[in-house]
Structures are given as C-alpha cells and as structure tokens.
C-alpha cells in the first residue's frame, strides 16, 4: 500500500477512535431543571394546565419542570423569551391559541412566527367554544339565533370576553359562514361578559365551555351549541354548532413548543411523555374542570393542526380588516 494512503487510513482510524469517547460520554438529556414559560398569570387556566403537565413531565424525566409565568402584551413577553432561548430542550413554552395564531396579527411588537421560530412538540388540550343565550331571549336554538341575526342585522348582541380573543373570532366566523350580522360586544374579561349575559344586558355570549358549563347546568344560561366536531364526554346532549353551520369547529387550545432547532430526540421524548400524561385518568379529570380535553398525537399531528389553525384565524382577521396595534 502506498505510503500516503497508509497515512490517510491511519489518520481516519485515529479520528474515529478519538471521537468514540466523546460520543459515548455525551450527556443524556435532561441533566438539569426545565423552564416552562406560560403566557398567563399564576392561577389562570393556562397556568394550571401547565402545572398539571409540568408535574407529570418532571416525574417522567426525573428533573423538575419550573413554571415561569410571563403574562402581558398578548403573550409577546413569553414567546420572545422562547425565541431567544438556546435550542437545547431546557426552555419550553405552553402558549394558548390566541398567543400563537392571533397576537402576531394584532400586535405590532410581535416579531415571532409560530412555525418559523418554534418547534412544535405536542398538542396538549383543546377547549371547544360554546354559544349560550340569556334565559329570557327568544332564541331557543343556535339556528334561531342565526336566523334572527340575518333578519335583523346588528340587533342581536353576542358578547365575548375580550376583543380578538378566540371566542370573539368564533362569533365573527359564524357571521362569515352564514351572512348573519351580529352586534359584537367585547368585555374586559370573562366575568364581566358572563354577568352581562346572565343579567340580560346582551342576548348571547361565546366562550370556552369551561367558564359556561356551570351556569348552563345551574339553569342560568341556555346552551345553543358547542363548536366541536363530535359530541364530547360531559357535554352529551348539547347541540353541535356544525349541524347548523357546517364546518364550524372552533377551539381554544394549548400547544407545547420549543425553540426551532431543538434536537429531534428531545422533541420526540417530550412528545411521548406528554402523550402518556394525557392518557392518565387524573389528568383527564383535572383538564375537564377547565372544559379542556386532552389531544394526544404525534409531532406531525400537532404541526398539521397548527398550520390549519394559523390559516383559519389569519383568514378571519384579514376578512375583518384588523390591523396590528
């Protein structure tokens, strides 16, 4: 064998030998606590959902998952922190739907894109939107409400917890799909909106099932429809919105994300552990308290869902002519 070839072969062998210990000694993930950013204050539904999942992940990974609440600015603070974090699996976020698919279109300061800047790991849970009426209002069904808003444009009021929230956009979507024209009334928070519809200050109200179900069961609000594809446990007998308005399936949701570039093995491990957690009876029961339903699936499932939701809500926002403020 020529001398130069022998030298190249020896160099290659030595390089392989030298690299073996480094690969063998690469530390397994995780080796330290994991930070989980939440774009909502402590005690809120997003915070409590994050703590449920964080507790399960911490036990499965044998490392604490530390909840870091960063509310404000439509979720921009939390998501900017995620965007600038190292892509090493030690900083995650669990944003709610509006933070991911609405804020980038309505806040000038939002410089992130949920698909470009972040690695989606798993869908954690979905909360279907619900349409209710004041008990004295003549609309007995969802079809009644739509017909009334068609016959008398801007005379049937429908409330929502805040402007450009998922409930607000869900109600706007009803009008877009049916040519019904509701009078949209946005409040400062859920409590104000619920009080208004119970008192009869507004006719209808839209929100996630969590805040509404107790009042419906107490006979203080009339359920008109739930905007989910199929009937869900605990909501048996409630009409589906898509029976009146085809394709009207609208949810609030929570999605686990990491900085773009996070190693694939870390992403897959997190996805697997989240799916395990969502199959546990105590998680299902605790989620149900918020009207949230676990949604296990693959990373690809979560990415596909996010793509579809971005398209849906960007279309609604564009049709409404809403601009970043």
What is the predicted function of each stretch?
Residues 1-31, 143, 325:
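Short, low-complexity disordered leader/linker segments with a strong preference
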Residues 14, 96-98, 127, 137, ...:
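Short, flexible active-site-adjacent loop segments at beta-strand->alpha-helix junctions, enriched
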Residues 31-33, 176-180, 217, 223, ...:
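An extracytoplasmic/periplasmic, membrane-proximal ligand-sensing/linker region
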Residues 24-116, 154-155, 177-204, 296-297, ...:
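N-terminal (or domain-start) structured segment
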Residues 98-109, 173-177, 204-237:
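A ligand-binding cleft/hinge motif common to bilobed small-molecule-binding domains
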Residues 57, 81-90, 105-192, 240-241, ...:
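Hinge/capping helix and adjacent helix->loop/strand transition within the periplasmic-binding protein
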Residues 45-49, 53, 57, 74, ...:
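Stable alpha-helical elements in mature extracytoplasmic
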